Amino acid sequence: MNKITEYKVYNASTLEGLEIIVNAGISVGWQPIGGIAFSSITMNYFQSMAKYDTTTNNG
């Protein structure tokens, strides 16, 4: 497994909005981690995203 070099959490008020920003992130090298979370307090959807060190050779 490659080392995570960057990590962020995307959030949006709708699933459709989250889908748009997650797909935009994927197009520039971000990868989703796990599933989508929803906060009943903020009424937002969340997706963890990471970039990995692709230069590491883990044999």
Can you name each region flagged by the protein language model?
Residues 1-59:
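Terminus-proximal functional modules
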